[in-house]
Every structure is written in C-alpha cells, then in structure tokens.
Amino acid sequence: MLAKRIIPCLDVTGGRVVKGINFEGLRDAGSILEQARFYNNELADELVFLDISASLESRKTTLEEVMKVSGEVFIPLTVGGGINSVERAKDVFLHGADKVSVNTAAVNHPELISRIAEKYGSQAVVVAIDIKKIGSDHMVHTHSGKNPTAYEALEWAHKVQELGAGEILLTSMDRDGTREGYDNDILARVSTSVHIPVIASGGAGNLEHLYEGFTIGHADAALAASIFHFRQYSIRQAKQYLRDRGIEVRL
C-alpha cells in the first residue's frame, strides 16, 4: 500500500502566507520562506504553493517567489495560481516546481490539462477543484471561489482524469478554514470514482480529521494549513498519530 501523504499548503498573496475562512477574511500566517524551510525540515511529504489572487487579478504567479521557495525545499513542490498556458507552466517548472496546479484556466480551457500532460507527463499536472454545496450538489467554482460554474464535482473530476490530470486537489469551500473536518462525503465519492490520487483539502482542525480524511474520505493525501501554520501541531506529530492508528506514512 502506498504511504499516505501530509501536504502543508502555502496560500500566498502580497508576498506573505495567508489563511482565511471559506476563502474570505484572510489573515497573515507568516513569511513564505520561513514557512517553506519549516515544512522542509518537518518531514512534510510535499509542499503546495498557491498564489491565491493570481487568477482573480488576471496576473501570473510571481516566478521570483517560486524560485526562492524551490531553493529552500528538497521535497516535491506544486505551484498554482495564474497558470493559463503551457508556456506559463514551462516557466514555473524552470523556476523549480515539480508539479503545476491548474484550476480556473482548466475550467475555461480544458484542453490545457492535456497539453501540459502531453509535454511534461500526467504526474506533473494537479487539477485543483474548489467546490461549494448548492442545494444537494457540490458545484465547482473558479477565480478563488468567486465564480460558480455549471460543473458538478464528480462530473468535473471524471473529465479532468480523462484529459490527463495526474492528481486532483479537492477543496471544500464550505469547510475551508473552519477546522470542522474535511467534507468526507464528497471526498469519498470522488476518491472512489476516479483512479488518480485525490488530495483532501478544506477543514482540517485536528489530527483525527486527517485520519478521517484517509479512512472515511479515502483520500490519498491530506492537505492542511491552519493547524500547521500556527503550530497547533507539527507534521511529525501528525504522522506519528496516523502511524499509531494504522495509517502507512513516511517517518
């Protein structure tokens, strides 16, 4: 069985790490480089760097920041935000990213997923899916959660898999920053209906939530921010807790 991964996420805007609730009310969560160094030393399996205002502001991810982070970490680095072309993905890879995360641009131009996958391999393409419950449906949103789309979560997950995505980053906007736990219902439905890895995101508030994301949500990896940024728990603590509960992790 493949080891489950713990992935801290750096939501970045204005040159700082930030964290909000339900994609709103952002507060400062520290220096980008200090957080990156911390997670590199803390046995994080990977690191995600998301420029959360790039698509909203119709601009590109700051390559200088990506290069600085990539120079500080020796774990796989996924970069997202404003990646809307193969050329832009190339720039991000050249500045040290191991994977790119596409979201808004993938919805607007689904062929972008295939084009990046064909050039760099599916393993280098993460499709971020931001979902919000509307009625009984989990609807996909773009532009940092501002714009609803016509896609339902399962429908879009299947489509991105067919287009060549190597991984899905599934974020519940309803749970984001609430520390109430992942939305394990939709997480399990997506995870069990696709054959590519699914990363749980949005809502981790304690170590039991990570465990539930793996056991109830069937996630392949758990992404978290608040519980690690503000040092509520260390990643070493999280991994030991999971190992003690029978979850295979790298320690």
From Swiss-Prot:
InterPro entries, A to Z: Aldolase_TIM, His_biosynth, HisF, IGPS_HisA/HisF, RibuloseP-bd_barrel
One MF annotation (Gene Ontology) recorded for this entry: imidazoleglycerol-phosphate synthase activity
Record's catalysed reaction(s): 5-[(5-phospho-1-deoxy-D-ribulos-1-ylimino)methylamino]-1-(5-phospho-beta-D-ribosyl)imidazole-4-carboxamide + L-glutamine = D-erythro-1-(imidazol-4-yl)glycerol 3-phosphate + 5-amino-1-(5-phospho-beta-D-ribosyl)imidazole-4-carboxamide + L-glutamate + H(+)
The keyword Cell wall biogenesis/degradation belongs to this UniProt entry's keyword annotation: no
Cellular component GO terms held in the UniProt record: cytoplasm
Tree of life domain: Bacteria
This enzyme's EC code(s): 4.3.2.10
The keyword Amino-acid biosynthesis is annotated on this UniProt entry: yes
Chief localization: cytoplasm
Group of enzyme by EC: lyase
Enzyme active site: D11, D130
Compartment(s) of residence: Cytoplasm
Gene3D superfamilies: Aldolase class I
Keyword list, A-Z: Amino-acid biosynthesis, Cytoplasm, Histidine biosynthesis, Lyase
Pathway connected to this protein: Amino-acid biosynthesis; L-histidine biosynthesis; L-histidine from 5-phospho-alpha-D-ribose 1-diphosphate: step 5/9
Protein's GO biological process: L-histidine biosynthetic process
Protein function: IGPS catalyzes the conversion of PRFAR and glutamine to IGP, AICAR and glutamate. The HisF subunit catalyzes the cyclization activity that produces IGP and AICAR from PRFAR using the ammonia provided by the HisH subunit.
Record text on subunit structure and interactions: Heterodimer of HisH and HisF.
Protein family according to the UniProt entry: Belongs to the HisA/HisF family.
Identification of the protein by name: Imidazole glycerol phosphate synthase subunit HisF
Native source organism of the sequence: Chlorobium phaeobacteroides (strain DSM 266 / SMG 266 / 2430)
